[in-house]
Design a protein with these regions (language model features):
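A short, N-terminal "cap"/entry segment at the start of jelly-roll beta-barrel domains
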Residues: 1-41, 57, 123-126
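Conserved short histidine dyad/triad with adjacent acidic residue
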Residues: 30-33, 45-62, 96
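Histidine-centered metal-chelating micro-motifs
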Residues: 54-56, 76, 92, 96-102
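Ligand-binding loop in jelly-roll beta-barrel domains
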Residues: 96-121
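Short histidine-centered beta-strand/loop micro-motifs
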Residues: 39, 56-61, 103-105
């Protein structure tokens, strides 16, 4: 894959998937993987969660952290036992080693970017 420069969401081909054993099928596209960047980015994905679907609860390693940037819609974010409402404009950090998941209980499709970063230093367990 060439270095990442620019991508338009309307040009993406979305693939159905069941994310981390979540409920139902979400749709996503890998915009760019690690090879497309010169920094510590593992990947940038665009995802759409139709009403009633979810990204299942899961945990990344201590060498990865993940960002969710919500573009539209609303959802319930579960992180380490706590649930928070998220909506358009929210940027959420899922910490290294932290458990998290996202569900869409609402009537509209939840659209977001998922960005995974490589941790330069490995965090100590909490």
């Amino acid at each position: 894959m060439p270095r990442f420069d620019r991508e338009n969401l309307s040009a993406l081909t979305l693939e159905p998937t069941r994310a981390h054993h979540g409920v139902g099928q979400i749709h996503f596209a890998r915009i760019a993987g690690a090879e497309a960047f010169e920094s510590a980015v593992n990947f940038v994905d665009y995802a759409e969660l139709p009403p009633g679907t979810s990204i299942g609860r899961h945990r990344h390693g201590l060498d990865e952290e993940e960002l969710y940037l919500v573009l539209s819609g609303e959802g319930l974010l579960w992180r380490d036992g706590q649930t928070t409402r998220v909506g358009a404009g929210d940027l959420v950090r899922n910490v290294p080693g932290g458990a998290h998941g996202l569900e869409n209980p609402g009537p509209e499709t939840l659209r977001l970017f998922v960005i995974e970063l490589q941790v330069v230093h490995v965090a100590q367990p909490r």
